[in-house]
Amino acid sequence: MTAGMGHSFRRNMKWALGPLPSARYWLGVEAPAWAQVVAGSEEIVGGLLGEEGGAAGAIVFTTKGVVALGPEGEVSTQFSYRDMGRMGTLSKDSGAPCEVPVTLSDGRLVVLRVGPPIGVRFAVATYLLLAWDVWRGRS
């Protein structure tokens, strides 16, 4: 991963998440061991820690897609960037982000906000901006 990619990822995460502490999200080179297990053979681009700071409720971004984890650290939802890219194109046509609600296995709701493609090599920076809409038990 290039330094520019890391900068774009952090900038996009800050834009999407607002004023959260930087420790809440990390780049691939800082990925915890459990994130590599989730990603398998895919390269990790970055991620967002769950409520307790570990695998529970976290989201891992790889070069091929997004993996959302449930309360026990199990995989609850997966998206490919190809699917997210289609939604990003719809977003470009409408001028507003597409919002994709994802319900984790413990009932918490995460809203993935997909913006239009911006011409960056990696799909994370190109298609996906993540926002925690409902994270602390609200639905």
Segments from the language model and where they lie:
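Anionic N-terminal interaction surfaces
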Residues: 1-59, 108, 113, 121
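Intrinsic-disorder/low-complexity coil detector
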Residues: 18-20, 31, 70, 96, ...
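Generic serine detector
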Residues: 8, 22, 41, 76, ...
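Phosphoinositide-binding peripheral membrane targeting modules
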Residues: 47-97
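Charged/polar, solvent-exposed surface patches and flexible loops
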Residues: 11, 15, 36, 86, ...
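Terminal and domain-flanking low-complexity segments
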Residues: 6-8, 118-139
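Canonical pleckstrin homology
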Residues: 56-57, 90-125
